């Protein structure tokens, strides 16, 4: 059987067009063995291979090579599917660049919003003597169809009512196979969008007619025209959605926390109110200490495992001991009545129940075909996770450095530990059992959402816990001697220290970022969109030394620190002896320590003379200070502790840990005592180099860093990619996000324009997600009460109201703010549930402070917010739901 590949491509001098495919004749998928195509003139390239008649379907790609440089197509490959009775195939392809409407190719649209039911799939199979047309048209709505109309009777003579409809089985690619003899050797054609039922024309393709010509038609040849893109008028789509953590959901079936199956009620409500997205916080297992500290969803013990608290126990099974079951039922009712999540009691009860249930039915579950398939597909992460969980329980700590012979992960040792003959097997298999049921329940929700045309949007944390399975199994992928965080911002004046180790991107790059790809592909089993938490981390991360506590002592990594010579060239008189160590002056001590000043001097400081002091060896790092005062929470000790931490922040430059002798200006260095000690000329010089360092110097450098990583990761799944790009944003970030078509995040109270207090919603980019607030902020009602002067300006300048602003955010004001956000050009408007409810004075919570999910400035915050009304109640609120539906519809969403 003969297959001829043909493609038009205009090459430059020295370039060659290559063909790489899964067959032996095309290099078996190895790019280094790709074949060189023949140039037949006029930019037409071709290549013919002989293959067995029994060949199976295969994928292939085109490449352009010039020396060592390679230009590749978009990540979606071409696919050859053998047909019927054809002895020769002509594949007339088009080069595939990344489409301009990339978000519509994501599974958020193909499997969710524009999901098309296919009770009996009919994949396109070419046959001898036919021409098959394949075209990408991802923006067609579920009630629309694509027709092929043309200049010959077989194509309806330009009459849509007589034209043939394309098949959407492989949506967003459409296909149609026609008899070549009826088409003739040459004709013109276009594609037309119509309503499926009425055949009412929605849109014709724009531009000149397409032309097909075959000078040598053959009854034994199957021709496939592929790679076409629908060239229609722009049809903007805007959607709305709700953001809420799973643990915050409340239903009548709950066990004191939200569960995966509760999301089906939220899907129903989204459908009822014209919403298409449900955005969640991370749902991975965070069990490390067994305390409420594990409520923090961004500190997972595994980037793959799901959290056991999200299981609906009644769907897993009921205990055979009726008295014991009755005790759990009573506890469930008690916990479900609580206003907030009691994390410790809920998780303790659920794990106790699951242990009992596992004893009763675990063997049957683990011997089922469904579980065996799940285990085969997930063993690479499931077995290490289950072993980690067993060892954590056994040693009473997640700090694997305290696990004796298991402190360093050894694959063969863990295989023995998990073997069925191991005395620890049952403790390991318990976690197999739990993860399998979590998989079943979340998969059920995903399928339910797909059928409803609703998208589940997940969240990818930027960091991993330093006491996690990932750090235990793959320590070489992380910089374990560092901590990730964020520089100071509106949320935290001392910056944020998340405690996570940072990524060693150089090591990760060696295997093509395999760990990241596996993580994202696993996530795509349950979600069709995701939010990259702190997308700036892919450009650079705020890295803090392990012996520091405050984010103020961090620096960017990767970065280009300054040498003393470069500082001198910029006119700055650098002196490491006092500019890189805490600069403590006598006159500041009393302001900080008050009546305890003399005691602090005696116990913790060293007099250097000339009014300067050093911290003694007991207190020369922030980690030592925190450890020393651990457990001391009286007023005096807290004041002294915080004062000493403040003194340690008083440095003007920080030495780079990887490049000794090179330095970073300390963030907000102009607020230090060392800066105040400079003369005016040196202050001005520092200000100039500071601005250049933080806002200009690294733009191209960080852009290159991001483009090494993000394209590979974005292309690894079909999920819609959104980025959290708030905070200190270098100019390269929006540029790269636009290039990769990653949706940005827009919030009116956090504008990205300089010298602007409130964002202009009408100027938000189309490729963005807009919202009123996030889980790290107060809701719009809480924000309204935080700063009366700012609120007054918003009331007058943004809302255009005159007079005094109300002291509280009244429902009509909330409605105005919600409508303003909905009016933005942003593709998505995803609001917290609390802000949707704020427009109704009867339904919203009385105290807006009780709606807070997280306070970033508090490093040990208890994440326990729950809805104050149940989802069943919300679904029954017909008047409110209709009002919300109409509000969203009026906004064009």
For each feature predicted by the language model, list its residue ranges.
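Catalytic cores of glycan-processing enzymes that make or break glycosidic bonds
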Residues: 101-132, 179, 211-893
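Aromatic-rich carbohydrate-binding modules that target alpha-glucans
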Residues: 10-55, 65-85, 137-185, 194-217, ...
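A short, amphipathic beta-strand motif
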Residues: 2-7, 129-136
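Residues in well-ordered beta-strands of folded domains
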Residues: 6, 20, 38, 63, ...
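Short secondary-structure junction motifs
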Residues: 14, 57, 143, 186, ...
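Boundary detector for helix-to-coil junctions that initiate low-complexity/charged tails
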Residues: 91-101
């Amino acid at each position: 059987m003969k297959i001829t590949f043909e493609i038009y491509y205009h090459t430059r001098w020295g370039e060659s067009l290559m063909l790489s495919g899964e067959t032996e004749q095309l290099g078996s998928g190895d790019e280094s063995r790709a074949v060189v195509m023949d140039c037949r003139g006029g930019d037409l390239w071709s290549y013919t291979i002989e293959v067995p008649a029994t060949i199976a379907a295969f994928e292939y790609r085109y490449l352009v090579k010039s020396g060592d440089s390679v230009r590749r197509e978009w990540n979606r490959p071409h696919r050859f599917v053998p047909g019927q009775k054809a002895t020769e195939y002509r594949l007339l392809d088009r080069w595939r660049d990344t489409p301009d409407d990339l978000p519509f190719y994501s599974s958020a649209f193909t499997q969710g919003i524009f999901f098309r039911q296919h009770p009996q799939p009919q994949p396109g199979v070419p046959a001898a003597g036919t021409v098959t047309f394949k075209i990408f048209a991802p923006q067609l709505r579920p009630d629309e169809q694509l027709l092929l109309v043309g200049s010959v009777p077989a194509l309806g003579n330009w009459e849509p009512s007589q034209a043939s409809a394309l098949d959407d089985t492989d949506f967003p690619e459409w296909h149609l196979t026609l008899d070549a003899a009826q088409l003739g050797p040459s004709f013109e054609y276009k594609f037309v969008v119509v309503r499926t039922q009425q055949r009412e024309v929605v849109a014709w393709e724009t531009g000149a007619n397409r032309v097909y010509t075959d000078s040598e038609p053959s009854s034994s040849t199957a021709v496939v025209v592929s790679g076409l893109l629908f060239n229609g008028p722009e049809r903007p789509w805007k959607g709305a959605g709700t953001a809420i953590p799973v643990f915050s959901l409340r239903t009548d079936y709950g066990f004191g926390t939200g569960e995966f199956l509760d999301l089906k009620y939220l899907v129903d409500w989204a459908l009822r109110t014209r919403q298409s997205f449900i955005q969640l916080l991370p749902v991975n297992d965070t069990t490390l200490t067994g305390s409420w500290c594990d409520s923090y969803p961004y500190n997972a013990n595994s980037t793959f495992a799901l959290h056991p608290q999200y299981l609906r126990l009644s769907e897993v099974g009921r205990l055979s001991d009726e008295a014991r079951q009755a005790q759990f039922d009573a506890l469930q009712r008690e916990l479900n009545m609580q206003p907030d999540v009691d994390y410790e009691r809920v998780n303790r009860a659920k794990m106790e129940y699951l242990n009992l249930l596992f004893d009763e039915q675990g063997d049957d579950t683990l011997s089922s075909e469904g579980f065996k398939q799940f285990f085969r597909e997930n063993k690479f992460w499931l077995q290490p996770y289950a072993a980690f969980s067993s060892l954590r329980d056994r040693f009473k700590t997640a700090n694997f450095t305290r696990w004796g012979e298991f402190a360093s992960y050894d694959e063969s040792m863990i295989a023995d530990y998990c073997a069925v003959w191991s005395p620890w097997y049952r403790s390991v298999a318990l976690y197999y059992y739990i993860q399998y049921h979590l998989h079943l329940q979340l998969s059920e929700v995903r399928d339910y959402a797909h059928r409803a045309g609703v998208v589940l949007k997940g969240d990818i944390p930027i960091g991993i816990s330093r006491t996690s399975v990932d750090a235990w199994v793959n320590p070489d992928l992380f910089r374990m001697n560092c901590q990730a965080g964020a520089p100071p911002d509106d949320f935290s004046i001392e910056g944020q220290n998340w405690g996570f180790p940072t990524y060693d991107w150089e090591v990760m790059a060696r295997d093509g970022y395999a760990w990241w790809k596996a993580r994202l592909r696993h996530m795509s089993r349950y979600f069709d969109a995701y939010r990259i938490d702190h997308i700036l981390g892919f450009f650079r991360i705020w890295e803090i030394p392990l012996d520091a506590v405050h984010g103020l002592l961090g620096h960017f990594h990767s970065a280009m620190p300054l040498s003393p010579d470069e500082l001198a060239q910029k006119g700055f008189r650098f002196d490491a002896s006092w500019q890189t160590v805490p600069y403590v002056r006598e006159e500041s001590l009393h302001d900080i320590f008050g009546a305890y000043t003399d005691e602090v001097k005696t116990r913790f400081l060293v007099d250097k003379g000339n009014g300067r002091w050093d911290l003694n060896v007991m207190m020369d790092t922030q980690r030592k200070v925190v450890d020393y005062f651990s457990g001391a929470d009286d007023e005096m000790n807290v004041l002294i502790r915080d004062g000493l931490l403040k003194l340690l922040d008083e440095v003007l430059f920080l030495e780079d840990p990887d490049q000794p002798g090179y330095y970073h200006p300390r963030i907000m260095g102009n607020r230090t005592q060392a800066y105040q000690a400079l003369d005016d000329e040196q202050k001005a010089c520092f200000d100039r180099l500071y601005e250049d360092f933080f806002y200009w110097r690294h733009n191209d450098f960080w852009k290159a860093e991001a483009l090494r990583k993000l394209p590979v990761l974005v292309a690894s799944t079909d999920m819609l990619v959104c980025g959290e790009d708030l905070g200190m944003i270098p100019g390269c970030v929006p540029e790269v996000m636009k290039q990769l078509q990653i949706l940005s995040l827009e919030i009116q109270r956090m504008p990205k324009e300089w010298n602007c207090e409130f964002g202009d919603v009408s100027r938000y980019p189309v490729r963005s997600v807009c919202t009123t607030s996030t889980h790290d902020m107060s809701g719009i009602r809480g924000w309204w009460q935080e700063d009366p002067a700012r609120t007054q300006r918003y009331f007058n300048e943004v809302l255009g109201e005159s007079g005094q602003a109300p002291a509280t955010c009244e429902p009509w004001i909330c409605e105005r703010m919600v409508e303003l956000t909905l009016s933005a050009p942003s593709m998505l408007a995803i609001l917290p549930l609390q802000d949707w409810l704020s427009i109704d004075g009867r339904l919203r919570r009385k105290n807006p402070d009780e709606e807070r999910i997280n306070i970033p400035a508090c490093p040990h915050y208890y994440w326990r917010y729950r809805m104050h009304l149940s989802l069943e109640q919300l679904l029954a609120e017909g008047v409110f739901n209709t009002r919300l539906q109409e509000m969203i519809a009026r906004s064009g969403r």
